[in-house]
């Protein structure tokens, strides 16, 4: 029989907090995957497409500086985007110079719709004051997480 989180020293609220990022990722995937299903991509592709859109000609190593994916994850996502015709690589050899195709631009053009759906589905029940407080808290939390990551590299 499964044990409760109390048996491991966590209250249910603490356990929910620990698993919050996983739940948020799952819900973002549900929303995004529906929106992008007809294009044949998943929601996680959008972040890489957005970076390429914002930095035309970027290489994979530089994408890692913007998105917190590891090297192999970036490589797999870029390969999927290349294979799907969303991105082209104009460089030769080991370096890369990534550019969006029309298909990639079409996916990026759906960003406002994705943002709207996320805002409505996830944050629609919050007041402006609650959203402001949450955003300020996440800014502080993100800063602290970055400090921990940087001090351990």
Please name every model-derived segment.
Residues 24, 28-31, 67, 107-125, ...:
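Alpha-helical linker/hinge and terminal dimerization helices associated
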Residues 21, 49-52, 138:
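Hydrophobic structural patches
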Residues 26-73, 84:
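N-terminal helix-turn-helix DNA-binding core of bacterial DNA-binding proteins
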Residues 79-139:
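Charged, amphipathic alpha-helical coiled-coil/dimerization segments
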Residues 1-39, 86, 97:
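N-terminal leader segment of winged-helix/HTH proteins
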Residues 16-19, 47, 62, 132:
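Active-site phosphate/pyrophosphate-handling residues
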Residues 1-9, 128-153:
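C-terminal regulatory/oligomerization modules of transcriptional regulators
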